[in-house]
């Protein structure tokens, strides 16, 4: 069932067992899992069926620290959430990402990758993925890895008809959950703002917050402020340990032999470090994206010459007025260390149209990120040399420790942390079942629960964790 606004929903008489706020990949996945087990779900989407500027304005905010995107540019506020601009790259977090590392403070999840594996077949079905090939070591330190370019499923489009026909899911559009009401043990209700006005409150036995890697923190921070920590009773880590995937063009590669690794359909290949290399070199996880540069005609001859006689190639290119790269560009996207000071906060004065404080994001890259960028490129270069596969040229700004360029991608638009998973309430917000510490009936879905970020795009892992949470809630609510 689909309703436009809370009034139409109330007129239906639908009674939910679970209220989910946010109809993106996590929220829709959890709702479908619960409905399949006969559990009734009210699924609240703050936006409508399509993009509109008025709704998107609610996502404006400010950023302090390193250059970053506008907060209303890096996510979307309508049915399907940020899947509506997802590029479609898929890979689940690596096993090493879940492990504690002595050189990475506050690393280590309370679960393992094996806890997600029972749900991966469903993930593949939902995201329309082919089977992943196993990682292929090209040295002790570097392995070829597969990222699959999926059809970039738009969750709102794909599941809209199924939801509209469901007797167990009530999707309520244009209805913004502004805050939750709790007493430090249970959430009793959610306050709503619907179609431009006060929507009252709605009660349910259980609540799931799944509004994204920024909004989850915002909603809970505002709820806590209004209820004297009645929603997150142990708030030390709330909004904290926020992470992105910094990514930059770090250099070029001249390739002699590519037979040891595979390219995808658009001439790209992906590499990441072994678990042993991460520990020995004291690195964060990282991914190198190798993009072949196809040159037609005369340019191809010069590019080929660059592999054999770079000085001659440079002279020829200069004489022809050509600025040629080597045979491949190297983009490095990396894990970010979970830092307490990187956090989502409420702006002290700026509010949205519903009166909710906007986000003030505090975000900086640290020394471990810079170390990983340089050492990762060195490690990849060493691997090419040892195996006579090619050579790497590292960009001068990377090699000499200059400032990060501001005219590149900056980051992956991947919002992780803020309500991270852990066993210690002083350093986490949810437990291994994604339940908020100290609360009986409040759960969180999405990448905000990531303890660490790994190096790969988060959507595949978001869906796997959402399926796991749906399975857990089914067990809890069926008792």
Predicted feature locations:
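Extreme N-terminal leader/targeting segments of oxidoreductases
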Residues: 1-18, 36-37, 467, 475-479
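N-terminal Rossmann-like FAD-binding beta1-loop-alpha1 element of flavoenzymes
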Residues: 16-43
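Glycine-rich loop(s) and the adjacent beta-strand/alpha-helix scaffold that form part
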Residues: 36, 49-50, 193-265, 446, ...
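A glycine-rich dinucleotide-binding beta-alpha-beta segment and adjacent secondary-structure elements
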Residues: 170-183, 325-336, 341, 359-363, ...
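FAD cofactor-binding and catalytic pocket of flavoenzymes
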Residues: 235-241, 245-359, 364-371, 412-415, ...
């Amino acid at each position: 069932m689909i309703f436009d606004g809370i009034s139409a929903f109330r007129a239906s008489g639908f009674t939910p067992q679970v209220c989910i706020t946010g109809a993106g990949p996590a929220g829709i996945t959890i709702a479908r899992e619960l409905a399949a087990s006969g559990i009734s779900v009210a699924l609240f989407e703050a936006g409508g069926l399509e993009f509109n500027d008025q709704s998107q304005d609610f996502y404006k905010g400010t950023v302090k620290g390193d250059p970053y995107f506008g907060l209303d540019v890096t996510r979307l506020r309508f049915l399907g959430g940020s899947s509506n601009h997802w590029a479609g790259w898929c890979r689940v977090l690596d096993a090493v990402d879940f492990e504690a590392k002595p050189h990475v403070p506050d690393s280590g999840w309370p679960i393992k990758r094996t806890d997600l594996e029972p749900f991966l077949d469903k993930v593949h079905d939902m995201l329309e993925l082919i089977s992943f090939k196993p990682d292929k070591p090209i040295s002790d330190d570097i392995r070829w890895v597969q990222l699959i370019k999926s059809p970039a499923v738009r969750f709102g489009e794909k599941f809209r008809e199924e939801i509209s026909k469901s007797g167990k899911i009530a999707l309520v559009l244009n209805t913004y959950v502004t805050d939750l009401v709790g007493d430090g043990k249970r959430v009793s209700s959610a306050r709503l703002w619907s179609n431009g006005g006060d929507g009252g409150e709605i009660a349910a036995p259980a609540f799931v917050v799944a509004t994204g890697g920024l909004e989850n923190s915002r909603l809970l921070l505002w709820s806590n402020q209004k209820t004297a920590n009645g929603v997150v009773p142990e708030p030390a880590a709330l909004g904290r340990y926020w992470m992105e995937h910094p990514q930059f063009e770090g250099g070029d590669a001249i390739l002699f032999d590519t037979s040891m690794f595979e390219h995808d359909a658009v001439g790209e290949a992906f590499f990441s470090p072994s678990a042993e290399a991460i520990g020995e070199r004291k690195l964060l996880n990282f991914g190198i994206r190798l993009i072949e540069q196809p040159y037609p005609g005369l340019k191809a001859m010069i590019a080929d010459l660059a592999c054999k006689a770079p000085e001659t190639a440079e002279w020829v290119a200069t004489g022809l007025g050509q600025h040629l790269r080597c045979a491949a560009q190297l983009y490095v996207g990396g894990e970010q260390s979970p830092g307490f000071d990187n956090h989502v906060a409420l702006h002290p004065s700026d509010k949205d149209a519903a009166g909710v404080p906007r986000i003030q994001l505090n975000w900086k890259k640290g020394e471990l990120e810079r170390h990983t960028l340089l050492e990762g490129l060195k490690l990849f270069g060493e691997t090419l040399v040892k195996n006579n596969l090619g050579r790497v040229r590292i960009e001068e700004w990377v090699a000499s420790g200059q400032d990060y360029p501001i005219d590149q991608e900056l980051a992956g638009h991947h919002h992780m942390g803020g309500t991270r998973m852990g066993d210690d309430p002083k350093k986490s917000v949810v437990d291994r079942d994604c339940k908020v510490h100290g609360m009986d009936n409040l759960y969180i879905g999405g990448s905000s629960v990531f303890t660490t970020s790994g190096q790969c795009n988060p959507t595949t892992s978001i869906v796997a964790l959402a399926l796991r949470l749906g399975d857990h809630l089914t067990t809890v609510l069926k008792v």
